Amino acid sequence: MTSTLLAPPLTAPSDLQAVLKKQGFAVVGSDAVSALSSVSHADLVRLNSFWNNLPPDQYLKDGGRYRRRRHASFLVQGGVVSQYAHRAHWQPLSYNALHGGMRRWFEPLDSAMTSTVAWSAVISFLGRVASGLRGEQTWFVEAHPFRIDTTDGIGRPTPEGAHRDGVDLVAVFLIGRQGIKGGETRVFDVSSPLGQRFTLTEPWSLLLLDDARVIHETTPIQPQSELGWRDTLVVTLRASGFLDEAAQPVA
């Protein structure tokens, strides 16, 4: 029996900022991403091949082999995107109880991807969305391309469970999914039991999250064939600097 996937509640491009402010999250389809970023769908899809060369995540505390990823940091100032010196990814335990509290060094994004006009345009677009929420300012951006696969039978997109990221805006692009079941996205209001669940299936569709107002998670994936996978691009934007171990208050 084939399970029915719940479609996401798509928002029109013209309503994006209003919906995001009203409910704390919004989902737009790939056509909207293309229109809002001024990047053709063909140019977006050309980036997909970079997900075929992601190194294994060596930091998984559950012993899994199901996650591959890279990491890079950027600044967005007045719509201009510049790459920041390569740095460790760090989160406090209060936001990531499983992998927080340690400096995780991942291989950088391929320069052949980050040097494209399409990449800069997508990141600049996200900067505009963040400024629409919090006001125009410099944005400190971290980008994480992920591949979750079913090497271990089950792959966990969010092994830390439902969480926030400690930033202002979280963007989750669904790059593709192949030969899997599961991978349902769940978004909950941070101060009430209200929530929604849906499954992103369209390549380059986008979930945007006001991190102060909602928590989110994605359910595990299981194979429908010999090996399945789910590719995403997670981009976080934060005002007032990157999340940094040195900047945390001493208890």
Question: How should these model regions be labeled?
Answer:
Residues 31, 77, 144-146, 174, ...:
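Structured loops at beta-to-helix junctions and adjacent beta-edge loops in soluble globular domains
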Residues 184-251:
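Catalytic core of Fe(II)/2-oxoglutarate
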Residues 133-202:
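Catalytic core of non-heme Fe(II) oxygenases with the double-stranded beta-helix
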Residues 68, 137, 165, 212, ...:
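A short, structural micro-pattern
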Residues 27, 145, 170-172, 206-208, ...:
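Conserved hydrophobic/aromatic beta-strand scaffold that supports enzyme active sites
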Residues 76-142:
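Signature of the catalytic double-stranded beta-helix
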